[in-house]
Amino acid sequence: MQKTYLWALVSLLASSLVDARSAVFDQTPLDIGGSDDSFDSIARIDPNSNDLLKSEMDKVIASSELLSLHRALVEIKSISDNEQAVGGFLMDYLYSKNFTVEKQFVDYDDPTGKPIRTNRRFNIYAYPGNSASPGIILTSHIDTVPPFIPYSLSHPEPASFKREDILISGRGTVDDKASVACQVIAAMDHLEKHPDIPIGLLFVVSEEVGGRGMSTFSNSRLNSGTYHTIIFGEPTERALVAGHKGMVSFTIRVHGKPAHSGYPWLGRSAVSEMLPILTEVDRLGDIPVSQGGLPSSEKYGRTTLNIGFMSGGVAANVVAEEAVANVAVRLAAGDPEDAKDIIFRAIRNAATKHRKDATVVISNGLERPKGDIEVIFGLEAYGVVDIDADVDGFNVTTVNYGTDIPHWKIYGDNVKRYLYGPGTIFVAHGKNEALTVGELEAGLEGYKTLVAKAAERERS
């Protein structure tokens, strides 16, 4: 891991020597004699000349500080709970650009959600000089979902090559290393032009698995409350997000009684009892509140549920003793505690309708069960998150995914929160995670616009 990020840093710094005239890096295409929108030398290449095509695509990446930084970040594996290597690389990179960098260690969780002390993974908080409490902060996460997918380049039409159409693929290319790279370069550009208006960078771990990185920052001295604008990075297709749905998660655990499958009446199948419960749970977002369903709203649409995992039993010839299901709820309205009440009532009603003497209890999942059916709610729960979207020139949308925004406690009045980034969430966790050079570079311009608007607020 150490060698990987050191190699990436050396390669990236070497590429930056192409133009060391200032701290702001040239974002214009490398001129190799082509027209404004294509490279003639590549347009004449036989489409089957893969080696030459790859070489020219590599040149495009190496010629840009943004694209080179993005590549270096993506090439370092940083699956949640294992972000140390990419964190070390990013710290060294920011040091080399004259940022003051603070490392904030983040604990791991045990099964109860209590922190386990460790010095392995860490957040990164960077700022210029002694300006530890800037008014503007850019923040993204440096962890990714599994599995790791290596960085690669391709082009849909090699015979009519355009640099902006180069497709950059790999885990984290979109979520969230595109935003990390853009935010770093946007901050450097801003500080070169406006050194009197400091800007901070916060890169956190663990966003994909509960948000402990942001929670750690939020509860620390670094969350000074002196900021007036926070710009969060996530894939939004370069739209400003006016808000996102809330989140509730829960596990259902059914305890049955094992028996020989030839004599099922001698036991009680946990799987058979789970099925009507899940059928009822699955429809909670589709029925009105008056009929026991979960709320909807004009802004966010209907609440959705996903039964993401289910298991039960040990063999076809054994009546199942245990069954487990995990469910994620994206709340479109209402309080998460009210949603939990609705969910619990639905589970209890379905269970007792199937078997009158069924006992349903809320549990922490760790103690000896006190009922036939346990409902275990996750530690993370929050309602809808409304976000600012008042900067001209952007499309405005809402999203269904969760972010670190609710994990950051805001101190002070009139703090603007923006959510923006290049790439689409539709590929973010998939095997086809990717974005084009054009999308990444346009994302940088959007961040520059948001930073400029934030700087205007500071001047006023």
From Swiss-Prot:
The active site is at E207. GO terms for biological process: proteolysis. SUPFAM superfamilies: Bacterial exopeptidase dimerisation domain, Zn-dependent exopeptidases. Its EC number is 3.4.17.-. Its main location: secreted. Residues 1-22 form the signal peptide. It is found in: Secreted. Disulfide bonds: none annotated. Glycans are attached at N98, N395. Belongs to the peptidase M20A family. This is Probable carboxypeptidase TRV_02791. It comes from Trichophyton verrucosum (strain HKI 0517). The lineage of its organism: Eukaryota, Fungi, Dikarya, Ascomycota, Pezizomycotina.
